[in-house]
């Protein structure tokens, strides 16, 4: 496994101290880790400050930490929160880097081959490489990850062995250095771009694969390195110097030459065996031979090929069926694993492997891939559990699995620092529920900044209710899995900004949606037993109203199901704990005030485009650089809407520059 090098301390920055039952939860969780307890549960209600508790535990135990979330939206939210808590430490983000992904597949019944199609998000690729660099270099690393952490990536041994350490005063033949950078997946380029380098006289500028704020400038006298400077990648203005530097590869799939040669030999051996298997099936034989030999030639020439991950077992030296190397292998043995919303995340861990294997079966069976492609896969749940040496399951509604594995090490965190108790749900008849809901919505629309969440049982019903309310002049929309991640984030922002008053959803409104403006949660057809109306789901839905002092929950049902009964009893129990605490400490519930990050250029966009038309060519070039820098900065902070506007301004400046240059040429 990978190991940390630098031994910095986690330094927690927080404008407040632990309160309520946070101090006891922090103490018990920290002590459990120190005592070697393998699994613990933090059972924390919505709004009780679970993330703050996690941050305190991380600071106390001071070991590399992986926080696992079940979707990208929650991972981004946790990443931002931990970045604020640990500004001095390496807080990283590791999710799937695909903006679009159509996996390779073959449908035998229609003889249809679907080639893999994808669009990689450059910014997320950078963040992934930054994450692995940090965990190999320093112990004060906290990585927030989606389920991507169990998918195969290159070996940490190969990755770290391809890192290049340079020291001032030593000799590095320039041609050899350039060749080494190419082998590390940096490309020679005359323009500044990530994972690239350029040579100008005695200087080599390297634009790092894992860093957008800094580039590296190497200055030579003949072949002797006389200076290493960090510079701004846009302006090339020096920031600071260093006497040595370690440069990490531009891809997780880099391999030393000896490993690559061995991999080519074993790929050829597997191909020969498969040719014998397909004896009498010339179509499959030819198909597999052509593809595999082409891939081998590409690996020989440039060390890479399209779909190289399907040969990953050959590069790691693993036996057939052995677990792939993944992000978890980059961590040292003593790392802490925190699984957020564990009741959702653990079932996801179980499901990933089965779906992957069923898709690849036909690819291998019909000669599109070698059988080793099966080993380019996510971990099975049993394989993933081998890394659970120190795990904290975090959930308001932990499942039976977490309860069982924790063996009684369950720490409750029920009390909210705000003093807001769980709203006690009202049960109303399902008959006429839409008319009753409409009246409740109208009551809240008369008040300022109170929003409504409506939980339906199907996507179609969510869309129909949104359309019905919109026809009545109510600002309503729906949210479900058919909507892209970026658009979901924008919808939630619009709700907080007041552009939307009513949001109708199915399942996405359960965990992690932090909306203090929501004063009413209406659960339609609450008596329809099933996954979306289980006691855990109902408790999670009710928690969405527990951030507002006027919070109210209405369950529309004609009967009280066992799940509803459990939800009502558990809500009453938690409510009593909070009210008793409030009375004992003379606490008056206070509303949560959570700032909304406004877009600083929304009102000025039109003025900016007008100003561009008045600029000279030189000024436009400067504006393009400024907008590009602002775009990447906004993307780093996960303000994607803001980043898109800077992108549009950058493109407008580029068009204006082309127009002006055309006019200048015509004028000449």
Curated annotation (Swiss-Prot):
Residues annotated as domain UVR: 621-656
Residue sites binding ATP per the record: 44-51
GO CC annotations on file: cytoplasm; excinuclease repair complex
Main location: cytoplasm
GO biological process, one term: nucleotide-excision repair, DNA damage recognition
Keywords carried by this UniProt record: ATP-binding, Cytoplasm, DNA damage, DNA excision, DNA repair, Excision nuclease, Nucleotide-binding, SOS response
Compartments reported by the entry: Cytoplasm
Residues in Helicase C-terminal domain copies: 433-596
Boundaries of every Helicase ATP-binding domain copy: 31-416
Sequence motif Beta-hairpin, location on chain: 97-120
Recorded GO MF terms: ATP binding; ATP hydrolysis activity; DNA binding; excinuclease ABC activity
Annotated S-S bridges: none
Family the UniProt entry places it in: Belongs to the UvrB family.
Database matches in PANTHER family: UVRABC SYSTEM PROTEIN B (PTHR24029:SF0)
Oligomeric form and interacting partners: Forms a heterotetramer with UvrA during the search for lesions. Interacts with UvrC in an incision complex.
Notes concerning its domains: The beta-hairpin motif is involved in DNA binding.
Cited function: The UvrABC repair system catalyzes the recognition and processing of DNA lesions. A damage recognition complex composed of 2 UvrA and 2 UvrB subunits scans DNA for abnormalities. Upon binding of the UvrA(2)B(2) complex to a putative damaged site, the DNA wraps around one UvrB monomer. DNA wrap is dependent on ATP binding by UvrB and probably causes local melting of the DNA helix, facilitating insertion of UvrB beta-hairpin between the DNA strands. Then UvrB probes one DNA strand for the presence of a lesion.
Protein name according to UniProt: UvrABC system protein B
Encoding gene (name): uvrB
């Amino acid at each position: 496994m990978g190991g940390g090098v630098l031994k910095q301390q986690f330094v927690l920055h927080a404008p407040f101290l632990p309160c309520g039952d946070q101090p006891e939860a922090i103490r018990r969780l920290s002590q459990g880790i120190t005592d070697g307890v393998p699994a613990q549960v933090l059972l924390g209600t919505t709004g009780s400050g679970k993330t703050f508790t996690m941050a305190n535990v991380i600071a106390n135990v001071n070991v590399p930490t992986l926080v696992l979330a079940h979707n990208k939206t929650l991972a981004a939210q946790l990443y931002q929160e931990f970045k604020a808590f640990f500004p001095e430490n390496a807080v990283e983000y590791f999710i799937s880097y695909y903006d679009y992904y159509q996996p390779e597949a073959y449908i035998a019944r229609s003889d249809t081959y679907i080639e893999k199609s994808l669009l990689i998000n450059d910014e997320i690729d950078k963040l992934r490489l930054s994450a692995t660099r940090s965990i190999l270099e320093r112990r004060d690393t906290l990585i927030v990850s989606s389920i991507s952490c169990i998918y195969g990536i290159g070996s940490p041994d190969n990755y770290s062995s391809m890192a290049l350490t340079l020291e001032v005063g030593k000799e590095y033949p320039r041609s050899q250095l350039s060749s080494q950078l190419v082998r590390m997946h940096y490309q020679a380029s005359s323009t500044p771009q990530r994972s690239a380098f350029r040579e100008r006289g005695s200087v080599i500028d390297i634009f790092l694969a894992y860093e957008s704020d800094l580039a590296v400038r190497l200055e030579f006298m003949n072949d002797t390195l006389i200076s290493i400077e960090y510079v701004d990648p846009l302006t090339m203005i020096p920031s600071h110097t260093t006497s040595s530097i370690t440069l990490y590869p531009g891809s997780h799939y880099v391999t030393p030459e000896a490993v690559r040669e061995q991999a080519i030999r074993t790929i050829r051996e597997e191909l020969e065996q498969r040719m014998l298997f397909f004896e009498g099936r010339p179509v499959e034989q030819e198909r597999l031979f052509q593809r595999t030999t082409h891939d081998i030639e590409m690996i020989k020439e440039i060390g890479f090929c399209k779909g190289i991950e399907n040969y990953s077992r050959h590069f790691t030296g693993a036996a057939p069926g052995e677990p792939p190397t993944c992000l978890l292998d980059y961590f040292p043995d003593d790392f802490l694993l925190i699984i957020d919303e564990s009741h959702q995340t653990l079932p996801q861990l179980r499901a990933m492997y089965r779906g992957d294997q069923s898709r690849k079966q036909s690819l291998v069976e019909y000669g599109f891939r070698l059988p080793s492609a099966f080993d380019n896969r996510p971990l099975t749940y049993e394989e993933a559990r081998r890394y659970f040496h120190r795990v904290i399951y975090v959930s308001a509604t932990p499942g039976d699995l977490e309860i069982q594995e924790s063996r009684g090490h369950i720490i409750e965190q029920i009390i909210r620092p705000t003093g807001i108790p769980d709203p006690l749900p009202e049960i109303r008849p399902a008959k006429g529920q839409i008319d009753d809901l409409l009246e409740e919505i109208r009551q809240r629309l008369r008040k300022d900044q109170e929003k409504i969440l409506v939980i339906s049982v199907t996507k179609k019903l969510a869309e129909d209710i949104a359309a019905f309310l919109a026809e009545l002049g109510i600002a309503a929309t729906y949210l479900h899995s058919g909507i892209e991640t970026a658009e979901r984030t924008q919808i939630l922002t619009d709700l907080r900004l007041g552009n939307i008053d009513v949001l109708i959803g199915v399942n996405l409104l359960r965990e992690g949606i932090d909306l203090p403006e929501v004063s009413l949660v209406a659960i339609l057809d609450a008596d329809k037993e099933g996954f979306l109306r289980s006691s855990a789901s109902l408790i999670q839905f009710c928690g969405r109203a527990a951030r507002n002092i006027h919070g109210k929950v209405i369950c529309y049902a004609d009967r009280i199901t066992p799940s509803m009964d459990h939800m009502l009893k558990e809500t009453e129990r938690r409510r009593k704990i909070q009210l008793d605490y409030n009375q004992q400490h003379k606490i008056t519930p206070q509303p949560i005030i959570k700032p909304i990050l406004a877009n600083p250029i929304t009102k000025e966009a039109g003025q900016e485009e007008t100003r561009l038309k008045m600029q000279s060519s030189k000024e436009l070039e400067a504006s393009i650089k400024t907008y590009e820098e602002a775009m990447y900065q906004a993307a780093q902070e996960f303000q994607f809407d803001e980043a898109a506007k800077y992108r549009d301004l950058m493109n407008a400046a580029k068009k204006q520059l082309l127009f002006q240059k055309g006019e200048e040429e015509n004028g000449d």
